[in-house]
Amino acid sequence: MHDKILILDFGSQVTQLIARRVREANVYSEIHPYDVDASFIRDFAPKGVILSGGPSSVTETDTPRVPQAVFELGVPVLGICYGMQAMAEQLGGKVDIGHLREFGYAEVRARNHTSLLEGISDFTTPEGHGMLKVWMSHGDKVLEMPPGFALMASTESCPIAAMADETRHFYGLQWHPEVTHTVQGRAMLERFVLKICGAQPDWEMGHYIDEAVAKIREQVGQEHVILGLSGGVDSSVAAALLHRAIGDQLTCVFVDHGLLRLNEAEQVMATFADHLGVKVIHVDASEVFLRKLAGVTDPEAKRKIIGAEFVEVFQTEAGKLTDAKWLAQGTIYPDVIESAGKGKKATQTIKSHHNVGGLPETLNLKLLEPLRELFKDEVRELGVKLGLPPAMVYRHPFPGPGLGVRILGEVKRDFADLLRRADAIFIETLRTFIDKETGKSWYDLTSQAFAVFLPVKSVGVMGDGRTYEYVVALRAVQTLDFMTAHWAHLPHELLGHVSNRIINEVRGINRVVYDISGKPPATIEWE
C-alpha cells in the first residue's frame, strides 16, 4: 500500500499540476472535490493534505470551506493561495479583499527559517535575506494569522505571503508552487511531501506494472476482454499492460477509418500482432467512413459522423466475440478528474470518457480502465517499460477523427492520400533536423506538429508549364499544457527543405505555407 497525499480541489485551473508535481516526487496523490465527506477523508488515510487555489473569495458568504476533518486528522496540511486564505479564516485569522492585486512574478522574502522553506532560495540580498521568485495570482490576502502561526514569507504588497504553524505542521503559501514560473516550487512541494509528511517515495512505474497486473488478473479472472485499439498512446499502453496481465484473454479491435497517418495501420499491426503477440482484429472500414463523410464540410458534423461510425463498426465486431465479458478503455487520470467535474461529490458516478463511451451498456459488458490512475507522462513511461517503441509512445497528439479534421471542408480519399504523404515528409524532417544548441531533434522540441490540407488551388510553375494544384499548411507549436501555445520558430532551412520535398514528391501540391498563429487566438488544430 502506497503512502498517499490528498489534494482537495477548490476550482483552480492548475490543480492537476499539484498532483503531477507530487507524483514527480514518486509519491502517489489523488485530487478530490473540496466538499468530500469527513468519512471519505478519514478512510483515504493521507500522509498529508494539500488545499488548492480557486476563484472564490473567503470574504463572501457561501464560498468553499475546508472540511473540518482535514484539521482534525493530525497530518500536515499545505494551503495554496485560496487554500491558505480558507485555512486562515477557518482557524481564527482574518482575510480581507486586497486593494492591490498580485498577478504574475513576485519576489518574496523568506522569514523565520521554517521547516518548509529553510535552505530554499533563488538569491540572497546584500543584507543576507533569502529571496524566492514566485508566481502570484490573488486578490484577497491574509491580514491576521490564526493563533499558533508564524510569518514564513512576505512581499511589500503582501506582508503575510506565507505562514506556518510548526506544531501542527500547517502551512500556507499565497503563491503557486505547482507552476513552473515559481522557480523553487518543486523543491517546496518535495520538502512538504517527503520531509514534513514523511511519505515514502515508492510510486514508480516499474512497481506499478506488477501491482496493475495482479489487480487486473484478480478483477478479470478467466474472462475475456475487448479493447478498441486506435494506435494512440493511451489505448496502445492499455493493450500492452492488459496483454502482460491476461495474454490471449485480450482481443483488440483496430478500426481503420481511412484517416490515419502514413503506414500507421501497418505499424500498429506490426507492433501488437507481430512483435507483442496480441490478438488484433484489423477492420478496414475506410470505404464506409468516407462514404458517410461525402459532401460534409462542417467540422463538428464530421467529428460526430466519425465518432458514431466508429461506435457502430466497433459494436459490430465486438458483438461477434460472444465470450467477452469486459470492455477495456484507455481512460487516464485527467479524464477521470474532468468527468467528475468541479464541486461534485467524490462518491458520484464518474462517466466513461473515451471514444467508445456508452458501449458497456449497449454490449452488456463490464468496464475495465487499467490506466485511470495515471497522468499522460506516467502512461508514456509505463509504455516504454512494457516494451512499446519509444517512437510510438512519445508521438505527438493525434485527434480521434484523424485526418478528417486536418482536411478542411469535405473529406475525400485523394485529399487524405495527399495529406498523409505531406505530413509524413514534415514529421520525418523534424526528426532528422537537430538543433545545435540543445542537441535535440526539432520533433522533440515541438509539442505538436502536422500538415493541414487546404481545399483551394493556387497557380504554380513547374518546368516550362503552369500548374493549378492544392495548398498545404504546416503547423508546429510549443506548449507545456496545450491550454496555451506558441508557434514554433522552426529554422528557415528546415522549412525550405520540407517545402521543396513536398512540392517535388507529392504530385497535386504546389504551395506550402507555415502557420504562425498562437493559441489564443487560434486553436492548435484548424478544425
Swiss-Prot record:
Keywords: ATP-binding, Glutamine amidotransferase, GMP biosynthesis, Ligase, Nucleotide-binding, Purine biosynthesis. The active site is at 81 (nucleophile), 176, 178. One of its GO terms (molecular function) is GMP synthase activity. Pathway: Purine metabolism; GMP biosynthesis; GMP from XMP (L-Gln route): step 1/1. CDD domains: GATase1_GMP_Synthase, GMP_synthase_C. GO terms for cellular component: cytosol. It holds the Pfam family GATase. ATP binds at residues 230-236. PROSITE patterns: GATASE_TYPE_1, GMPS_ATP_PPASE. It catalyses: XMP + L-glutamine + ATP + H2O = GMP + L-glutamate + AMP + diphosphate + 2 H(+). SUPFAM superfamilies: Adenine nucleotide alpha hydrolases-like (SSF52402), Class I glutamine amidotransferase-like (SSF52317), GMP synthetase C-terminal dimerisation domain (SSF54810). The keyword Cell inner membrane does not apply. InterPro entries: Class_I_gatase-like (IPR029062), GATASE (IPR017926), GMP_synth_C (IPR001674), GMP_synth_GATase (IPR004739), GMP_synthase (IPR022955), GMPS_ATP_PPase_dom (IPR025777), NAD/GMP_synthase (IPR022310), Rossmann-like_a/b/a_fold (IPR014729). Residues 203-395 form the GMPS ATP-PPase domain. Its EC number is 6.3.5.2. Residues 4-202 form the Glutamine amidotransferase type-1 domain. Catalyzes the synthesis of GMP from XMP. Homodimer. This is GMP synthase [glutamine-hydrolyzing]. It comes from Paraburkholderia xenovorans (strain LB400). The lineage of its organism: Bacteria, Pseudomonadati, Pseudomonadota, Betaproteobacteria, Burkholderiales.
